[in-house]
C-alpha cells in the first residue's frame, strides 16, 4: 500500500472512530464523501474498502437511530483496524477489514446496495472531474 494512501486511511479511521465514540453519526456522511473522493483519486482496493465501510456504518447507524433498534458495537473492530494499519501490518489489516464488512453484511442485508452506491458516487465524481478538466 502506498504510504500516502495508508496515512490518508489512518486519518479517515481516526475521524470515524471519534464520530462513533461520540455518537455523531451525522458526521459519517462527510467522512464518507471524503473517502469516496479518495477512492476516486487513488483507485485502489484499500481506499474503496474504507469508503464502503464508512458509508455502510453511516447507513446502519442512521437506521438504528430512526428505528430505535440495537446497533452492533463495531468500535473494537474499528480500533483494531486503526492499530493494524498504524503498525503497517497490511495483510492483517485487510483480513480485519473483510471481517468487519462481513459483520455489517450479516447485520444489514442491504450491504450489497451500499457497495453499489459507493461505486456509483465514485464514478460520478470521476466523470465530473474529467468533464471539469476537459
Which residues does each predicted region cover?
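DNA-contacting interfaces and partner/effector-binding or oligomerization modules
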Residues: 1-72
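Amphipathic alpha-helical repeat elements characteristic of tetratricopeptide repeat
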Residues: 7-10, 75, 121-125
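Amphipathic alpha-helical repeat scaffolds
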Residues: 14-17, 82, 128
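Charged low-complexity stretches with an acidic bias
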Residues: 62-90
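Short, charge-rich, low-complexity alpha-helical interaction segments
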Residues: 83-105
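Conserved binding-pocket/active-site segment within a compact domain
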Residues: 103-134
